[in-house]
Design a protein with these regions (language model features):
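Catalytic cores of nucleotide-sugar-dependent glycosyltransferases that transfer UDP/GDP/TDP-activated
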Residues: 1-168
Length: 168
């Protein structure tokens, strides 16, 4: 922990600008450091760009749909979306278990899991490997083939489109 604090002190001493998401973060988190300088800190609050995130327009063709539909037996069913990095704390596995154990839910909807980007699970860090391996095992355990879509990759600029696909 001491090495981490030392490294953070060095970064603060040499940074031209530190970006935080809240003023509270500037005061409470960085205020404890020796090189605390609020003049070199700015807040960019999290938020949603409503120009990008909007309901689908009438006959809008959503390109990402082809990446999803190839997994699904009945792509016309509504989608339940989980979009996160493959991290145990994100509870992707619990979602799959709930979906797998609920026949009414499986009959009513498909599950779309966007869990980060990958080429080969074996090349990922051990935490991501574990989550994704268990995702695949649960899909197999509950025989969710044709009901779960889990594309290997997406771009950040496709996220609004993914939400429109789910809302369509």
């Amino acid at each position: 922990m001491a090495r981490r604090i030392e490294a953070e002190e060095e970064l603060l001493a040499n940074a031209d600008l530190v970006i935080t998401s809240t003023h509270n973060e500037i005061e409470e988190q960085y205020g404890l450091y020796n090189f605390y300088d609020p003049a070199h800190m700015t807040v960019i609050p999290p938020g949603t760009n409503l120009e990008q995130f909007h309901p689908p327009v009438d006959d809008e063709q959503i390109a990402f749909a082809t990446q999803v539909e190839r997994f699904l037996e009945d792509p016309k069913k509504p989608l339940i979306l989980a979009l996160s990095r493959p991290d145990e704390r994100k509870n992707i596995l619990t979602l799959i278990e709930a979906f797998g154990e609920s026949q009414p839910l499986r009959q009513a909807a498909n599950l779309l899991i966007i869990a980060g980007n990958r080429d080969d699970i074996r090349d990922m860090d051990s935490g991501s490997q574990s989550v994704l391996t268990n995702v695949l095992l649960l899909i197999d355990t509950y025989d969710l083939y044709g009901r779960v879509a889990i594309p290997k990759s997406h771009r950040a600029d496709e996220v609004p489109e993914i939400y429109r696909l789910v809302a369509a």
